Design a protein with these regions (language model features):
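Non-catalytic interaction/Regulatory regions outside core domains
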Residues: 95, 102-133
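Conserved short loop/helix modules at catalytic or binding sites
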Residues: 29, 58-111
């Protein structure tokens, strides 16, 4: 058990020390295609982690979905629009502009699907993420 706690701390440090990809500079070519990973999106003005997710393709998820995608593919933008604490973010375009003006993403590669799910939950807790997927 103690070893798992140490590993959890190292994983948290790994994502916090990973390269930052600022949404205002993000281009698809900056991200590896078809790389499975767990990622965190952070508000650079406050340091608050807004969202933690997992994906089979980091390029598609961050660029095509979170930045450019519609409400159905971009959960974080949906959460921002629906957040009563974000009264200036009234639509998906405003949410996109907020991401570009304020946010960056960091990720750690992970090929194993089960471990990605575990890491998503772990990092959501360890980083005290603001937005969590609704339960079904």
């Amino acid at each position: 058990m103690k070893q798992r706690l140490i590993e959890a701390q190292h994983i948290t440090e790994d994502i916090l020390n990973a390269p930052k990809f600022y949404f205002n500079e993000l281009k698809p070519s900056m991200l590896l295609d078809k790389l499975a990973a767990v990622y965190a999106i952070t508000d650079s003005t406050t340091g608050e982690v807004l969202y933690v997710g997992r994906t089979k393709n980091i390029r598609q998820r961050l660029y095509n979905n979170h930045l450019m995608g519609p409400k159905t593919n971009a959960r974080l933008k949906k959460y921002l629009v629906e957040d009563p604490n974000q009264p200036l973010i009234t639509d998906m375009l405003a949410a996109k502009e907020y991401l570009k003006a304020n946010c960056y993403a960091q990720y750690i590669p992970e090929n194993d699907m089960v471990k990605r799910g575990q890491l998503e939950g772990l990092l959501s807790y360890m980083l005290n993420v603001r937005y969590i997927h609704e339960e079904h």
